[in-house]
Amino acid sequence: MEFVVVIPARYASSRLPGKPLADICGKPMIQHVYEKACLSGASKVVIATDHQKVFDAVSTFTSDVLMTREDHQSGTERLAEVVDLLKLDNNTIVVNVQGDEPLLAPENVSQVATLLNESTAPMATLSVAIEEQEDVFNPNAVKVVSDINKNALYFSRASIPFDRSAMMGEQSTLDLTPFQRHVGIYAYRAGFIKQYIELSVSPLEQLESLEQLRVLYHGYNIKIEQAHITPQAGVDTPEDLAKVISYLQSKHA
């Protein structure tokens, strides 16, 4: 099985300006992500950016970097541009890896690519078990429910599935076993990425602010299974960055 990894690296970030170039133990964050992705077995790993500073920095460690337009409304639109620039065959599997995950588990990248490869679905993703009750009620932790055939039924910021007896009684009795948190890594068939951006925006997607709901709304399947490796948190804030640096320093001490 061959697959291509695309890592979007936008320079602008409201909470951490210049995020892809943030220094982590002597390397820019985007280089950490790239090196982890290269361990996944991908036939090609490409970084897609919209800023010259990122392009120049990435060019010091790989030639697989593309300059994309600044006016994309979503990450998927940027991905579609990359598919066109690389002239990928419609059946090529493309894994979209977030550029702010320097502790990325390569095993999860290959897992989501394999999950898609072994199905007829146009798209696949991963989840992890929710272990803390507060995450069930945290709208920033996106929950997902799936069917017996590993098809996602729905993604929501709400508490799904709704445990009627526990949630209408004492929450201390809540069993966390059915709850899964969505992990933001996706595998697509290249041809579907181009289809996706032509699909109309769905009311559910707008309500929940979850782009993947557009796929379900239009009747397509998204394959999902639990990640073999529980992913480490990404970097959104200076505090997150400090935690990652501390973690890597302690690991190499």
UniProtKB/Swiss-Prot annotation:
Pathway: Nucleotide-sugar biosynthesis; CMP-3-deoxy-D-manno-octulosonate biosynthesis; CMP-3-deoxy-D-manno-octulosonate from 3-deoxy-D-manno-octulosonate and CTP: step 1/1; Bacterial outer membrane biogenesis; lipopolysaccharide biosynthesis. GO terms for molecular function: 3-deoxy-manno-octulosonate cytidylyltransferase activity. Signal peptide: none annotated. It holds the Pfam family CTP_transf_3. Coiled coil: none annotated. InterPro entries: Cytidylyl_trans, KdsB, Nucleotide-diphossugar_trans. Activates KDO (a required 8-carbon sugar) for incorporation into bacterial lipopolysaccharide in Gram-negative bacteria. This is 3-deoxy-manno-octulosonate cytidylyltransferase. It comes from Pseudoalteromonas translucida (strain TAC 125).
